């Protein structure tokens, strides 16, 4: 078990100078590892995605981020998506290719 799985880490995202509502989000990878992010409700989720990918050492376009089964786009904010404290974002490996079997 890696350190990351043993104790979830957290990262603070957003502008600390301004007031604002923050929530803690859990980002769970396919390997069940958790990283916690504290984000401002109006922060574009691109920041969270970039930070997660940097920690994992993978390019951002190689992963897909989902909230309640829907893909998260870079310009969306937690407020737009109706996210609440401790909500979960799932991360999956991007899959391309394949063909129809019809």
Curated annotation (Swiss-Prot):
Propeptide, residue positions: 99-102
Disulfide bonds: none
Function: Ubiquitin-like protein that can be covalently attached to proteins as a monomer or a lysine-linked polymer. Covalent attachment via an isopeptide bond to its substrates requires prior activation by the E1 complex sae1-sae2 and linkage to the E2 enzyme ube2i. This post-translational modification on lysine residues of proteins plays a crucial role in a number of cellular processes such as nuclear transport, DNA replication and repair, mitosis and signal transduction.
Cross-link (Glycyl lysine isopeptide (Gly-Lys) (interchain with K-? in acceptor proteins)): 98
Lineage: Eukaryota, Metazoa, Chordata, Craniata, Vertebrata
The keyword Cell membrane is assigned to this record: yes
GO biological process: protein sumoylation
Quaternary structure note: Interacts with sae2, ube2i, ranbp2, pias1 and pias2. Interacts with sox9 and sox10. Covalently attached to a number of proteins.
Signal peptide positions (record): none
Gene, per the UniProt record: sumo1-b
GO molecular function list: protein tag activity; transcription factor binding; ubiquitin-like protein ligase binding
Gene Ontology CC annotation, any one: nucleus
Subcellular location(s) per record: Nucleus membrane; Nucleus speckle; Cytoplasm; Nucleus, PML body
Organism in which the protein naturally occurs: Xenopus laevis (African clawed frog)
Gene3D superfamilies from the UniProt entry: Phosphatidylinositol 3-kinase Catalytic Subunit, Chain A, domain 1
Keywords, comma-separated and alphabetical: Cell membrane, Cytoplasm, Isopeptide bond, Membrane, Nucleus, Ubl conjugation pathway
Post-translational modification (record): Cleavage of precursor form by a sentrin-specific protease is necessary for function.
UniProt keyword Cell membrane, yes or no: yes
Ubiquitin-like domain mapped to chain residues: 21-98
Protein name as annotated: Small ubiquitin-related modifier 1-B
Family to which the UniProt record says this protein belongs: Belongs to the ubiquitin family. SUMO subfamily.
